[in-house]
């Protein structure tokens, strides 16, 4: 029936009592007449009421009253507006249960009924207007008949919670209607409009009941006063209630009634059932009892709530069922074909045998009951619908399934149905005797005040129960009926649908069709008759009541099977450990044992740790003596609302665990770490055994303590006893300070986390005097500022055997002091010192930068005859600095004290399986006579070391100290051969468990759904297993939830991650599910209710529910208490420095956190609320637990702030619309590890030390401090996995480029096959910047986070096939290119052009190399612009170097955090082997391109350009760059070189003087093109040189020859290895005697002659910057008779070989060590770094290249000239500039024969000889030499004519 908005509605519902708690019920007051009371008008402001309704709740007539728009101004003192909303089409129905009465015709009946039972109900509420109060009193009952009228207009249903009341001043605008999710605002209806409509609709019978309003409105004459005793509230705590509108009226004027409760146990016998078994061996008809039955028991712990000694409700806290033993009867079936029929049993132990209850459709239909899949009941409008009436002849036994349902005692005579005039009203028919007055515990329904928050969906037992008040003295035990209790028995087989009088149990399964609205006067009332005996156990079927004759339509339906829902509880699953804490004297302490039962147990609490879920804090409810495994222990019980524990597959209330009783005194065998420490400190010479695994957390060290046991331990400690191995867990400092002649055996130290400023080791700082350490194993982390050893720092004449260390060692502290770091021992010293049959699995981060700073995989320093044998190391050593003594086995072996080889350290049968940065494989320092035998290393290990070559630092693969190199396939077997050591299995701590959730024993478990249960467990982390199985069975088999494993689920509001659930629980609308394969899906999420402090959500249309891994907890008290302390912390304070572990003199600059630190402090309150919400669960409000959290934060405030600042600084970036910072900081379970504490993790991060928090160490910091807690491998796999989840359709690089503000240019090759490879995202071929800087071979992977978090565009990045360049915009900033758009355009345009040049250069190399060389071009060379930044006033180039503390954004946000401290010098640029650094030159300039080809040659020649053969011994890096493989500086360079990078334009001004290739990308398509070009170029060179030579020998005098010519010789200097085979070219003047020999062209070759024009006297420095002049002949063919040629002759011959045989077959064999093996076979060897190498000689190369064609290089040179001479007759005609004429004349000369050219050459040679300017200091051939000018003109003409020598000049083209 549709109700009208203005109709009065009277609500009586016990459910509302549970919400309000302050209504008053007063009985035995009678009023003669019907009274309606208006509100008292006593206010100074205007009252406005907003009531929210939906358009479905109003009638068509009322819809016509809707006014569009919003209310504007109030017109009266008190007005009501009905705000109408329409439900959006995509929103779900949100209808509250129908519990109200809207039938005005029933009021009289209600009055008569209340008269009969003597019940008066007062509803008291208050409105406060300034200092005055409105008191509305609703009075019910009369003697002869009464009418109850409510004074307020009808509250709506669906949107009730939005109702609001405002006070506004006259003329003030009204508030706007609120926005409601899922609804659209329509308009409003004024209250007066409704009243007018209602005036026309009041029934006659109600009009007759009206009284004189004038009399009733004399408000001042009415004085209603109600008094309550306030004293009754002392020491009582009322449960949590979200709405308490009555409190205001009661405060000070009306006392509150006491709500009390007590707890009691109720025991009910469970009758045993009878089972009939067929026995084929018994004769048919024979019956015998096989087993006698035994009754069971159901024990319920019930909490009874009372007000004024009257019970108002009860709550079943726990139910324990002791199963009944069924009676088993055997029936014989022998010779009978038909088996006997089984009787129906009622055994509760076997609920599947319980016959179904019939569906109930009688009275009480207003209770909250919606059995699953039950068809809607017809609306009931008969007599006393909702009253407690027992139908005739129905005597059901209520128990088991129906236990706790609302029942009626047998003695009450049921009222007959009334069908008269006022059917539905509460009346007493004439023939029916009145019911006796009811005064039981629930007499009096409670009116619901306005604006009550909607009730959540009921999904489990006791929903809606009153929250437990704290410490209430229990009332006397109640043993009466359990009517009204909300009970759902645990895992009981579904009862049949019941249609009798008791339908109305409060159970509402999901997706059930709604019951018809009950409109009777007591709909929803829950009333218990007085003094009703407990109902008997239900043991069988209940027959449905016979329908009334006069109401044949109310026919009982057929029984329908109903499945009983499992009881929903809180269960802590997968418990791994339990920790007990206490508060005493303001300090918190962890207890691993107890001395006695504490008297102040309220100061104790427990932290329950799980292998899968968050820690849970629980208050202690009891500690009692007990035994476990025969040992006396303490049984400790912790409690929380609805918490149960699975004990042997049975649930028990609360959570219990056991704690050891601390032995008062232990002498030899120890089960307490504190006892052990105390005993050893008292007697350092005793013998001690572990009798259990010990927890070092038991001992709290003093500040500054360096170890647990002080002094020199000379006794014995054994970690095993009676065949069991034990461990000591959680050491925070070394166990011993010093071991002296001591013995430690069979001991394991697990989870060590040790830090210290001095030298440290996990077991001891030092072991000396023949100490024996055997079978000792350590795992964990050690961090220090100086020496570190995994076991001991220093072992002096002591033995370590069969021992191991596994973990991380961190020491990146920068100091000049010497130190030693080793995986097992830092320093091993003395002839009796030994490490044998041991191993280390390590990750070492160090900063060693001098030879006295040693780092080794097994030991740092091994000296004084100490020995390491039969041992190996595996893992990684990353030494950031370059010059320390670092190696995979031992860092340093030399004995510094004696400086004698015979006392050096020794290595025997050792193996290095370690990747080493800046070190060697076996030993870090090489010298002759090393005492190393049988050493091995892994070929696949990356071992790099830097060396100084000339003035450049070059990083290259270390070939020193590699030992015997094994293939990776041989490593495992070699390790086993060396030793087969493995760590023993040890006993766990007493409080540790490994109990995993086992769903297989849960009812309805399906093995095929194991993964579904595992996934639901993630979605419901705190619910019991039965609930998980229930929802696991609802997972659809075609859903992803059924097929893939969930790692985590994250709540979101659209794309925003929600962390603080308590503050945003209703805002969440999406659930992001992250699967193990890193796929994800978003499901719709809808908040539906709370269950025991858990917010419960509906997941889309799946039928599933979700609860976050958080309890609803308000942390404001904690936040408010710690906030002042945190905000008082100063970044530059000593407290911060102490936390970082640095002195006051150390700058904090390189942390780059100061700016973020201030921002973090500004938003601390919000951050802390999120952090605490994401952290450990506080299951029950407890001041001791809160204090523990407060204490932890205050004690670690500096570390917490540093950790928060660090994460907010480096992880503030997005994946699309999702910011990852909150995921990293708060959702550390995102990758599946649900038991991580974000608070602890962030504190530990902040405490991890200065070096770990350095910006440049951000990759290691994640891997060390965050990866394990996030269940991830490393930073980059984490970033990639985030991308897979949030941006699955993009590559990592695409995401990266969208996120970074750096300007990125990725220039792919112009070669198709290369470009295709480069487009392979994530491959080694990719030129994606992200792909490259995250590769394992990239040295500066720490660039990723700075690039992702840059706040502005200040850096550019250029990526090409072989290099990755970085530079700052401000490097190009000056007064011509000012900051802003102008500078940006200049930089970005030039960055693109530079990228193309670099691309072209390596396309050139790709085309001329073979397949092996081409593959090596796919690499990653770092290129850096200088740290020289200009401003808008800078002229030309900036010249001042910026330091790391510069405020320049490029330095502040990128270069500084990356931490590459580039050494700046006066060079144009320099290379280090893996990097290129521009200095004077700039990357984006044209000369920067030429510099690129030079420096990249240094980084490419050894492994790539030279075919992988390496540089020829004796040739320095500069030999291969300048004048050989780099591009010429300018297009007019008159040198023999090849332009490989710059494209010139025919229209350029420089075209007339260009002597180099116009466009290398077109000229060189393959190696043959290169050979063709050089060969044709040498046609011109050889021809012109021949002509000049002929002019010299034929035209010049001997004196002129002396001036015009020089000769070249070799000299040899012995090097550091004793070699004197590397030639240095020396240029000398020729003598007259020499000149006299020069009478033919060949004589110039034979006498090693060269031109004096551009070659000056003196030594041609080896490894120098030399070029071969294009127009100054070198006739000589000088070779090195001993070995390697000099720099000048080497370059010239190299190019001549390129012209003759090509790059691969001519040049490469000459300048590389290609023929080294041949040299060895020929007995030509040299020593390099103590190793014998083959010496490649010129003669060997000549013989191999030309296959014996030439006997010497002179013959080769003569042949080359002769080859061209033979073609002179075919010389092409050519026209060139006539250099004899002034250049302004533009005269040209054409020649067709060589003879013509010879004539011109003769003239030029004579002119130069006559001028004789060769020795003039200002002599420049291009201006002062006629020969030079002529040659240049001819060369240029032929260059142009042949289109860059695509054709020969000898083609007889006339």
Curated annotation (Swiss-Prot):
Which protein, by its recorded name, is this?
Immunoglobulin A1 protease
Task: Give the main localization category.
Answer: secreted
Q: Which family does it belong to?
A: Belongs to the peptidase M26 family.
Swiss-Prot/TrEMBL GO biological process terms: proteolysis
Instruction: Report the catalytic activity.
Output: Cleavage of Pro-|-Thr bond in the hinge region of the heavy chain of human IgA
According to its UniProt entry, what is the function of this protein?
A: Zinc metalloproteinase which cleaves human immunoglobulin A1 (IgA1) in the hinge region.
Q: Which residues lie on this side of the membrane: Extracellular?
A: 155-1854
- Enumerate the residues binding Zn(2+): 1494, 1498, 1518
Query: Where in the cell does this protein reside?
Result: Secreted, Cell wall; Membrane
Domain G5, by residue range, is: 256-335
According to the UniProt entry, where does the motif LPXTG sorting signal sit in this chain?
Answer: 96-100
The domain of life is Bacteria
Q: Which GO terms describe its cellular component?
A: extracellular region; membrane
- CC cofactor note: Binds 1 zinc ion per subunit.
Basic and acidic residues bias spans:
552-570
UniProt PTM:
The Gram-positive cell-wall anchor motif LPXTG is located in the N-terminal part, in contrast to such motifs in other known streptococcal and staphylococcal proteins. The protease could be cleaved by the sortase and anchored in the membrane via the two potential N-terminal transmembrane domains, whereas the propeptide located prior to the LPXTG motif would remain attached to the cell wall peptidoglycan by an amide bond.
Q: Where is this region: Disordered?
A: 533-570
Q: Where are the transmembrane segments?
A: 106-125, 132-154
């Amino acid at each position: 029936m549709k109700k009208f908005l203005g109709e009065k509605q009277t609500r009586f519902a016990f459910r509302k009592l549970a919400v309000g708690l302050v209504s008053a019920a007063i009985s035995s007051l009678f009023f003669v007449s019907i009274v309606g009371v208006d509100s008292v008008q006593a206010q100074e402001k205007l009252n406005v009421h907003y009531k929210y309704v939906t358009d479905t709740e109003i009638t068509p007539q009322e819809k016509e009253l809707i006014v569009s728009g919003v209310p504007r101004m109030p017109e009266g003192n008190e007005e009501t507006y009905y705000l109408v909303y329409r439900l959006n089409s995509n929103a779900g129905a949100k209808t509250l249960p129908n519990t109200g009465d809207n039938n005005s015709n029933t009021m009289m009946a209600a009055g008569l009924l209340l008269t009969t039972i003597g019940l008066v109900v007062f509803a008291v509420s208050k409105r406060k207007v300034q200092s005055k109060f409105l008191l509305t009193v609703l009075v019910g009952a009369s003697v002869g008949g009464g009418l109850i009228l409510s004074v307020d207009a009808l509250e709506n249903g669906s949107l009730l919670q939005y109702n609001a009341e405002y006070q506004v001043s006259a003329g003030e605008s009204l508030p706007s209607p609120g926005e409601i999710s899922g609804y659209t605002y329509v308009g409003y209806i004024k209250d007066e409009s409704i009243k007018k409509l209602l005036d026309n609709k009041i029934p006659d019978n109600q009009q007759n009941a009206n009284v004189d309003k004038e009399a009733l409105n004399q408000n001042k004459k009415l004085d209603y006063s109600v008094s309550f005793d306030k004293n009754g509230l002392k020491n009582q705590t009322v449960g949590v209630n979200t709405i308490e509108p009555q409190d205001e009226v009661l405060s000070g004027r009306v006392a509150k009634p006491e709500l009390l409760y007590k707890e009691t146990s109720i025991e009910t016998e469970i009758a045993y059932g009878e089972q009939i078994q067929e026995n084929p061996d018994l004769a048919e008809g024979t019956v015998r009892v096989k087993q006698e039955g035994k009754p069971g028991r159901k024990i319920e712990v019930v909490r009874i709530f009372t007000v004024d000694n009257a019970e108002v409700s009860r709550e079943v806290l726990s139910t324990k069922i002791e199963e009944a033993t069924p009676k088993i009867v055997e029936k014989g079936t022998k010779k009978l074909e038909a088996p006997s029929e089984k009787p129906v049993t009622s055994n509760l132990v076997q609920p599947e045998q319980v016959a179904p209850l019939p569906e109930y459709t009688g009275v009480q239909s207003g209770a909250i009951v919606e059995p699953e899949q039950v068809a809607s009941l017809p609306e009931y409008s008969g007599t006393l619908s909702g009253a407690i009436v027992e139908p005739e002849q129905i005597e059901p036994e209520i128990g088991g399934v129906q236990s706790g349902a609302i029942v009626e005692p047998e003695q009450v005579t049921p009222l007959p149905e009334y069908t008269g005039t006022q059917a539905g009203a509460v009346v007493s028919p004439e023939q029916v005797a009145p019911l006796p007055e009811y005064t039981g515990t629930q007499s009096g329904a409670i009116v619901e005040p306005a604006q009550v928050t909607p009730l959540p969906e009921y999904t489990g037992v006791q929903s809606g129960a009153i929250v437990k008040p704290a410490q209430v003295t229990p009332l006397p035990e109640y043993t009466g009926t359990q009517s009204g209790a909300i009970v759902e028995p645990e895992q009981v087989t579904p009862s049949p649908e019941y249609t009798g009088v008791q339908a109305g149990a409060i159970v509402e399964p999901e997706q059930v069709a709604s019951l018809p609205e009950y409109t009777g006067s007591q709909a929803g009332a829950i009333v218990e008759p007085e003094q009703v005996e407990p109902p008997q156990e239900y043991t069988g079927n209940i027959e449905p009541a016979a329908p009334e004759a006069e109401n044949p339509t109310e026919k009982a339906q057929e029984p329908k099977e109903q499945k009983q829902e499992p009881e929903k509880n809180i269960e802590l699953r997968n418990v791994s450990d339990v920790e007990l804490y206490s508060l005493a004297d303001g300090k918190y302490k962890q207890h691993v044992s107890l001395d006695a039962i504490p008297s102040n147990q309220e100061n104790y609490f427990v932290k329950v740790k799980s292998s899968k879920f968050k820690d849970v804090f629980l208050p202690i409810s009891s500690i009692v003596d007990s035994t476990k495994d025969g040992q006396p222990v303490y049984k400790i019980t912790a409690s929380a609302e609805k918490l149960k524990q699975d004990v042997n597959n049975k649930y028990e209330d609360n959570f219990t665990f056991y704690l050891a009783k601390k032995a008062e005194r232990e002498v030899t065998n120890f089960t307490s770490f504190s006892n052990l420490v105390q005993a050893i400190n008292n007697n350092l010479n005793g013998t001690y055994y572990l009798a259990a695994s010990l927890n070092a957390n038991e001992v709290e060290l003093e500040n500054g303590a360096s170890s647990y046991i002080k002094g020199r331990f000379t006794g014995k400690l054994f970690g095993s006893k009676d065949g069991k191995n034990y461990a000591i867990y959680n050491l925070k400092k070394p166990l011993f300070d010093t071991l002296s002649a001591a013995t430690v055996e069979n001991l394991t130290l697990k989870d060590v986390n040790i830090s210290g400023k001095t030298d440290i080791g996990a077991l001891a700082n030092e072991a000396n005097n023949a100490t024996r350490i055997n079978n000792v194993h350590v795992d964990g982390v050690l961090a220090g500022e100086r020496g570190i050893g995994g076991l001991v720092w220093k072992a002096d004449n002591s033995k370590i055997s069969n021992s191991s260390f596994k973990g991380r060692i961190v020491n990146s502290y920068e100091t000049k002091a010497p130190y030693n770091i080793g995986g097992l021992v830092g320093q091993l010293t003395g002839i009796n010192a030994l490490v044998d049959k041991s191993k280390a699995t390590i990750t070492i981060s160090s900063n060693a930068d001098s030879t006295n700073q040693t780092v080794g995989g097994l030991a740092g320093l091994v000296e004084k005859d100490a020995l390491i044998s039969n041992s190996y190391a595996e893992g990684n050593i990353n030494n950031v600095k370059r010059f320390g003594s670092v190696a995979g086995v031992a860092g340093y072996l030399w004995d510094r004290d004696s400086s004698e080889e015979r006392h050096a350290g020794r290595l025997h049968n050792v193996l290095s399986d370690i990747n080493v940065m800046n070190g060697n494989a076996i030993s870090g320092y090489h010298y002759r006579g090393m005492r190393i035998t049988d050493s091995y290393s892994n070929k696949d290990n990356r071992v790099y070391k830097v060396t100084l070559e000339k003035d450049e630092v070059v990083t290259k693969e270390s070939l020193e100290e590699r030992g015997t190199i094994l293939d990776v396939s041989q490593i495992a077997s070699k390790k086993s051969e060396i030793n087969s050591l493995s760590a023993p299995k040890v006993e766990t701590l007493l409080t540790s468990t490994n109990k995993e959730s086992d769903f297989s024993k849960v009812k309805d478990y399906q093995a095929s759904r194991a993964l579904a249960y595992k996934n639901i467990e993630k979605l419901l982390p705190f619910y019991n297993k039965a609930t998980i199985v229930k929802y696991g069975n609802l997972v659809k088999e075609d859903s992803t939830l059924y097929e893939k494993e969930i790692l985590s689920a994250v709540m979101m509001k659209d794309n925003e991650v929600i962390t603080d659930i308590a503050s945003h629980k209703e805002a969440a609308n999406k659930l992001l599910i992250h699967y193990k394969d890193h796929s994800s899906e978003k499901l719709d999420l809808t908040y539906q209710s709370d269950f025991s402090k858990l917010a419960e959500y509906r997941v889309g249309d799946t039928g599933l529910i979700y609860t976050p891994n958080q309890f609803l907890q308000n942390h404001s008290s904690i936040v408010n208490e710690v906030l002042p302390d945190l905000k008082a912390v100063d970044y530059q304070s000593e407290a911060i420095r102490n936390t970082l572990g640095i002195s006051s003199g150390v700058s904090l600059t390189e942390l780059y956190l100061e700016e973020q630190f201030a921002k973090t402090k500004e938003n601390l309150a919000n951050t802390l609320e999120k952090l605490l919400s994401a952290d450990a669960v506080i299951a029950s409000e407890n001041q001791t637990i809160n204090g523990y959290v407060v204490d932890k934060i205050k004690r670690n405030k500096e570390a917490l702030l540093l950790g928060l600042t660090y994460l907010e600084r480096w992880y503030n970036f997005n994946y699309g619309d999702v910011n990852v910072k909150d995921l990293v900081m708060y959702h550390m379970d995102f990758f599946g590890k649900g038991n991580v504490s974000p608070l602890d993790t962030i504190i530990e991060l902040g405490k991890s030390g200065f070096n770990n928090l350095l910006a440049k160490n951000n990759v290691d910091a994640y891997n060390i401090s965050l990866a394990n807690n996030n269940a991830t491998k490393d930073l980059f796999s984490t970033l990639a996995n985030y991308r897979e989840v949030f941006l699955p359709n993009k590559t990592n690089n695409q995401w990266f480029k969208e996120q970074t503000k750096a300007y990125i240019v990725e220039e792919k090759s112009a070669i198709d096959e290369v470009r295709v490879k480069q487009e392979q995202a994530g491959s080694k071929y990719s030129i994606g910047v992200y792909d490259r800087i995250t590769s394992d071979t990239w040295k500066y992977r720490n660039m990723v986070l700075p690039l992702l978090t840059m706040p502005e565009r200040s850096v550019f990045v250029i990526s090409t096939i072989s290099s990755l360049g970085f530079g700052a915009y401000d490097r190009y900033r000056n007064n011509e290119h000012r900051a802003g758009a102008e500078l940006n355009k200049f930089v970005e345009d030039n960055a693109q052009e530079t990228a193309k040049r670099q691309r072209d250069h390596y396309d050139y190399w790709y085309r001329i190399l073979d397949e092996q060389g081409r593959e090596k071009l796919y690499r990653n060379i770092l290129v850096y612009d200088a740290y020289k930044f200009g401003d808008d006033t800078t002229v030309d180039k900036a010249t001042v170097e910026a330091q790391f503390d510069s405020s320049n954004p490029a330095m502040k946000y990128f270069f500084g955090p990356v931490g590459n401290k580039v050494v700046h010098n006066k060079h144009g640029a320099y290379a280090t082997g893996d990097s290129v650094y521009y200095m004077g030159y700039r990357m984006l300039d044209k000369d920067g391109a030429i510099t690129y080809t030079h420096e990249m040659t240094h980084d490419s020649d050894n492994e790539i350009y030279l075919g992988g053969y390496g540089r020829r011994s004796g040739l320095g890096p500069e030999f291969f760059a300048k004048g050989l493989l780099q591009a010429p500086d300018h297009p007019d360079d008159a040198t023999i070189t090849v332009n490989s990078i710059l494209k010139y334009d025919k229209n350029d001004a420089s075209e007339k003087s260009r002597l180099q290739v116009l466009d290398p990308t077109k000229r060189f398509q393959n190696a043959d093109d290169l050979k063709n070009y050089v060969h044709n170029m040498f046609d011109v060179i050889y021809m012109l040189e021949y002509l000049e030579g002929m002019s010299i020998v034929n035209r010049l005098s001997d004196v002129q020859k002396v001036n015009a010519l020089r000769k070249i010789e070799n000299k040899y200097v012995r090097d550091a290895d004793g070699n004197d085979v590397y030639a240095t070219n020396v240029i000398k003047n020729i003598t007259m005697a020499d000149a006299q020999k020069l009478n033919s062209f060949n004589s110039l070759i034979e006498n090693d002659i060269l031109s004096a024009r551009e070659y000056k006297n003196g030594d041609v420095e080896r490894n120098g910057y030399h070029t071969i002049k294009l127009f100054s002949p070198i006739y000589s063919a000088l070779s090195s008779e001993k070995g390697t040629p000099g720099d000048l002759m080497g370059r010239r011959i190299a190019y001549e070989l390129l012209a003759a045989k090509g790059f691969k077959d001519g040049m490469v064999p000459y300048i590389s060590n290609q023929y080294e093996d041949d040299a060895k076979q020929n007995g030509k060897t040299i020593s390099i770094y103590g190793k014998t190498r083959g010496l490649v000689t010129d003669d060997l190369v000549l013989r191999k290249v030309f296959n014996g064609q030439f006997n010497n290089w002179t013959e080769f040179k003569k042949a080359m000239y002769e080859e061209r001479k033979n073609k002179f007759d075919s010389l092409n005609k050519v026209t060139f500039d006539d250099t004899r004429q002034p250049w302004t004349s533009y005269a040209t000369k054409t020649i067709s024969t060589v003879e013509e050219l010879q004539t011109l050459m003769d003239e030029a040679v004579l002119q130069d000889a006559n001028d004789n300017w060769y020795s003039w200091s200002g002599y420049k051939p291009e201006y002062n030499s006629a020969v030079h000018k002529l040659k240049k003109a001819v060369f240029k003409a032929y260059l142009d004519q042949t289109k860059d020598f695509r054709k020969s000049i000898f083609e007889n083209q006339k």
